[in-house]
Amino acid sequence: MSGFIGKEQHAIDDKGRLMIPARFRRRMTVVPDESLKSSRGSASDAGGLYVMKVPDGSLELYEPSVWAEKEQAIVRLSDFNPDERLLKTLLYESLDCVEMDRQGRIALSREFLQHAGISRDVVIVGANVKMILWAPEKLSKVVRDNASRFQVLAGRYF
């Protein structure tokens, strides 16, 4: 379903879990499931989401149906083309699967939290087919540093 819009601030709990906002959970097609035993493997199981480290210092969350579309393009990349092989390696190195429990929480690994600079507070930005997770101070800096660029880009595309 998707259509994630807006932003909310939440906190990572002591076990490294993040509560997905209720308004985003209502738009998801993923069904939370506490019975999943592992956070590794395929997120297409009930309750699974894909989480990806992004070069800008954020994390992105995708539902399996959305990630499947992206993966279609990735699998078409050639292992015999060095640039395409590198892209596949970098993408998959930056990717993990996480389960969502019945309370709507996901457990994020220390590696992923460190990548995003998230220690406790996190801003969850709804970006239509994905959710973007930011450390609040990083997001504030990106928005502040790119205010004039936003005007130019918005003028170009809207």
From Swiss-Prot:
Pfam families: MraZ. Residues 7-66, 95-138 form the SpoVT-AbrB domain. Its main location: cytoplasm. Gene3D superfamilies: Transcriptional regulator MraZ domain (3.40.1550.20). It is found in: Cytoplasm, Nucleoid. GO terms for molecular function: DNA-binding transcription factor activity; transcription cis-regulatory region binding. GO terms for biological process: negative regulation of DNA-templated transcription initiation. Keywords: Cytoplasm, DNA-binding, Repeat, Transcription, Transcription regulation. It comes from the Bacteria. SUPFAM superfamilies: AbrB/MazE/MraZ-like. Forms oligomers. NCBIfam families: PRK00326.2-2 (NF001476). PANTHER family: TRANSCRIPTIONAL REGULATOR MRAZ (PTHR34701:SF1). Belongs to the MraZ family. This is Transcriptional regulator MraZ.
